[in-house]
Amino acid sequence: MSELTALTIAEARDKLKAKAITATELTDAYLSAIDAANDAINAYVAVTHDQARSMAKASDERIAKGEAGALEGIPLGVKDLFATKGVHTQACSHILDGFKPEYESTVTANLWADGAVMLGKLNMDEFAMGSSNETSYYGPVKNPWRAKGSNADLVPGGSSGGSAAAVAAHLCAGATATDTGGSIRQPAAFTGTVGIKPTYGRVSRWGTVAFASSLDQAGPIARDVRDAAILMKSMASLDLKDTTSVDLPVPDYEAALGRSVKGMKIGIPREYRVDGMPGEIEELWQKGIQYLKDAGAEIVDISLPHTKYALPAYYIVAPAEASSNLARYDGVRYGLRVPGKDIADMYEQTRAAGFGKEVKRRIMIGTYVLSAGYYDAYYLRAQKVRTLIKKDFEDVFAKGVDAILTPATPSAAFSLADEVLANDPVKMYLNDIFTVTVNMAGLPGIAVPAGLNGQGLPLGLQLIGRPFEEETLFQAAHVIEQAAGRFTPAKWW
């Protein structure tokens, strides 16, 4: 069965089309793999055995009739942030206990319309708040990668840790994920997978539990660049139910792969050389520069002067929006309800019991920066900084730069239950140092594995593109992937 789960989406698609395998066989292979591995990795919070089998059966019938969709019979995992009709959707929070939506998110509806099969819901940081998948009510996810000669558990990154771990461990062919400040790109880098955060407005947010509405964007995590391009084509669409959705035709992203990058101008931002950055990250960055140079790209030094303000500004804007978005969870209509002596007490008790520590911390920060005395000093100033960050990118792109190459993360995956990070949230927030600018500016960004560190752990590079030019990112990422190769963890689970 493991040879079936080793197939990429592109390979499985071809075999299904040629009737060399059936969707039912493929789905059963993944369900068996999940049942065998999930206790160890904890990537799934709900496995939809019956639904997966009936969707696979329907796929086989459509293939037999010659009516196959673009993702016909491909088994996918869904981050627990996407509404799935009649299926567990709890954003990995206690406050949404037992919630099963009566509607489907636009992203998942698009995937099912193209014939994909749902294997289940994937673990994540609670309400997508975290960089290590340790804030989930359902416990942490373990990274399928381990350092050479070590049995120590590592984090898969966050918040889409379940998505990245499931893809890396071959527990799904691909997965949906979301990115508010790096939640697709950082876990992809930590697990040797590919993750793309599309331009804001490219993929509908409808039916996705909101964290920070002006920053959130859904995208895929996949095993390679081609698979990410295939998934992205199905996920992206115009959606009138999302007022930020953009009416632009969805290109065939897969067709961009293999196109030459000759003459493409790649910017290298000097501000991304941060103090204390490990030598192996700098080395990897240089390697990526060389890969693109060898393929004919032109490398130019650029400056993004407001980069240093991005992280503090992000950790004002995102919690502010979260404090507003999470005000709706009160125990009245759905989810957890803790009785109280009156309605105000019931709200208080429910929210105290329902939200985890990190979510409470961010709600409190958000409420504080939006309060009358501090709104101008914090929130308004952060929004001004955001405008300056966006302008930095616009200026660089106006000079003819096609894409920007940076590291994806400041380190490889770190230890699960790291005490220093547990006691110092700011140190944990620094994981997003290379990724938040992309969300603040609403740009597309892709993380692609580019090598292993001295301990044998994957490291990723990030490419940042012009708005709605994801094709350029796929094109350049494919060049790096071809040069660096693909990486799969040694099985310990």
UniProtKB/Swiss-Prot annotation:
Top enzyme class: ligase
The superkingdom of the source organism is Bacteria
Q: Which family does it belong to?
A: Belongs to the amidase family. GatA subfamily.
Q: List the disulfide bonds.
A: none
GO MF terms here are:
ATP binding; glutaminyl-tRNA synthase (glutamine-hydrolyzing) activity
The record's note on quaternary structure and interaction partners says: Heterotrimer of A, B and C subunits.
Q: What PROSITE patterns does the record tag this protein with?
A: AMIDASES
| Keyword Lipoprotein (UniProt) | no
Name the GO cellular-component terms. glutamyl-tRNA(Gln) amidotransferase complex
State the name under which the record lists this protein.
Glutamyl-tRNA(Gln) amidotransferase subunit A
Q: Does the record's keyword annotation contain Translocase?
A: no
Q: Which Pfam families match?
A: Amidase
Location of the active site? K79 (charge relay system), S159 (charge relay system), S183 (acyl-ester intermediate)
